């Protein structure tokens, strides 16, 4: 058993280094050319944020493996060299909260500051915004912790009677012993239903911070994850359905390119007008609304340009480029089909294991256990993959709603074309939702992840916090997740096969 524990510690160290390398790789390949050789602090924050997010997801499988290392021990501390998972959980999620509510906002305010101002003024402005945010968050946390930062555990009050101590022992004999030989039953076994009571204790402040961050993340996760779990595979499938069927002629290309050029000039003129308003200090609600609308138009314009380049490949290897385009859409269809199976499995598991009481089946829990029986880490790997899939669905849902809803700012993630503010926003969203993904997975896979430190934090403590426990008692987030997934499915069934019509002339709202 000790050898297994040593191997677990070594694997955890190696995986941590690999996660850091993956974070650097994603930054290098997704960053926009305009951010090359600059914006080093935001890049450091992005690498740190991605690393923390990935490690937080991987910690749940590590927690399960850590529990299995002690499965023959009477209590968890009886075996040596195990990972201190509860301490690691709290450390990671405190770091998560600091990044989301302090460090990433500071980096975004600094990066998006007026480039005409000096570095000192941009730093001062960013620090001022973050200080105000920190004071507000601190006051909210302190007040809530002081008023309702308690845990209410529902327990059953049990007691048993005892035999009366006799005054004399002379009356006892072999035929009449001191304690009757008739079958005895503990009085606690026959305790009435009204013996339930509430045991109240003060939650620790780190656990309370994690709990509130989980609530905020759960709201975002329910919305974006519920939409994304459906739009992620269906978007890929309908992208294949709407694919270009053949190469267009040169005259058609010139006509379409001319229209896109005209659109680009309109958007450039609008961007210059908004920049002048920003310099004059007119950054009100109307200005922010116009900036969001302009950002969405730019994303749509880039998509139209990419689609036009696909339909009319140029250069000496035009035929090879077209063949790669066709293969790319076939790949989208295959990945979409696989993703659809995973999404259906997720929704089915939520319904039959979480929403139906008692559960019809443990479903995915049983699959993971059987995979562990085939090979020690196979079930753990599948478990981690299902958790990662939820995070990818969150990003897909945010992208879809960002294009459809006016009040959501879109921050696209594109290979070789992601600006640092979009990077920071999506990393913050991933960090915030990663807490909820872990809580969601710990609940959905409670059978597989039983007796882990994650279940102690997210299962017992979180679901017993005063004022918050009812959201989990009545499965509010799970119902919302499934409902949004079904609504998104209907949306794609009705509108998914239609090609997007070109937008008209862009005008700033007055």
Swiss-Prot record:
It is a multi-pass membrane protein. The chain crosses the membrane at residues 8-28, 44-64, 89-109, 128-148, 221-241, 336-356, 375-395, 427-447, 476-496. Its main location: membrane. It is found in: Membrane. Pfam families: LMBR1. InterPro entries: LMBR1-like_membr_prot. Keywords: Coiled coil, Membrane, Transmembrane, Transmembrane helix. It comes from the Eukaryota. GO terms for cellular component: membrane. Residues 252-317 form a coiled coil. Belongs to the LIMR family. This is LIMR family protein Os06g0128200. It comes from Oryza sativa subsp. japonica.
